[in-house]
Design a protein with these regions (language model features):
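Long, positively charged amphipathic alpha-helical accessory segments at protein N-termini or as interdomain linkers
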Residues: 2-9, 18-19, 87-115, 125-252
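A generic structural signal for short beta-strands and their flanking turns/coil linkers
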Residues: 51, 76-78, 119, 151, ...
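N-terminal lobe of the biotin/lipoate ligase/transferase fold
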Residues: 1-109, 129-131, 231-235
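General beta-strand structural signal in soluble alpha/beta enzymes
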Residues: 57, 115-119
Length: 252
């Protein structure tokens, strides 16, 4: 499966040369997040990661998203976790969740899928019956002291798999191979490479992601309504209260 993914990924590369990857593909696992964590514990370098690593599974038994919520992961979707080289200095590094969400959204839009970003870490497919969840991200950073060693991203993308109420897949998208998971996995790898290229461009990532952000409801906090006013560089949601006070809401 690794060779097939790499071949399809190279076929999607218009100009850029092949990016090195260390891949592990599994028929089934409890969680790609767990598998990646074990791999990194055993073999990761002491300092920064230099070659991206990725674990992909045909299906997961216990996939999870934000705050431990279960993510349905049957065969037919793309279920993976990746460790990505990232700038060591936090002040110049883009938020990995924003960078990956932006890169994946742009890749899907370029192939005809109308998508938006839902804060904090979801991609929505715009359908005739309204927006539906298409993908979810689980981002993070591995630090040593104040320096970044690598970024981590867990990703679930609905391809041909059955989906629960409120979600969508890509079966009806001819530009995306009608959701064929191997081709979609290659597309995701290309999006991850794009995210790595954007990793040192925090402001470009923030503005790009903000342009694709779905409308966000007002937030009731501290006894008052706060209006969303875009994104902070770290991916937090900027909120403004009626008296002009500002705060950042973070859920990642």
């Amino acid at each position: 499966m690794n060779g097939a993914i790499q071949a399809k990924r190279r076929a999607l590369a218009a100009v850029e040369g092949p990016h090195p990857w260390r891949l592990r593909s599994l028929a089934v696992c409890a969680s790609t997040e767990t598998e990646l964590g074990r791999w990194l514990e055993r073999q990761a370098p002491a300092e920064q990661l230099t070659v991206p690593r990725l674990v992909v599974a045909r299906r997961q038994c216990f996939g999870h998203g934000q705050q431990g919520r279960r993510w349905e992961s049957p065969a037919g979707g793309v279920w993976l976790s990746a460790a990505l080289p990232w700038p060591a200095e936090p002040q110049v590094a883009a938020a990995p969740g924003l960078a990956v969400a932006l890169a994946l959204a742009e890749a899907l839009i370029a192939r005809g899928a109308p998508v938006q970003l839902k804060w904090p870490n979801d991609l929505l497919l715009l359908t005739p019956t309204g927006p539906r969840k298409l993908a979810g991200l689980l981002p993070g950073l591995r630090l040593r002291g104040s320096r970044i060693r690598w970024a981590r991203i867990g990703l679930g993308l609905n391809g041909r798999n059955p989906v629960p109420a409120g979600a969508a897949n890509l079966r009806q998208q001819p530009g995306l191979w009608h959701g064929e998971p191997l081709a979609l996995t290659a597309l995701v790898l290309r999006a991850l490479e794009r995210a790595m290229a954007l990793a040192g461009e925090a402001e470009a990532v923030r503005t790009g992601a903000e342009a694709l952000l779905a409308p966000t409801d007002p937030q009731w906090l501290e006894g008052a309504w706060w209006q969303p006013q875009g994104l902070a560089p770290d991916g937090g949601l900027r909120l403004v209260r009626g008296d002009g006070r500002e705060r950042i809401l973070r859920r990642f």
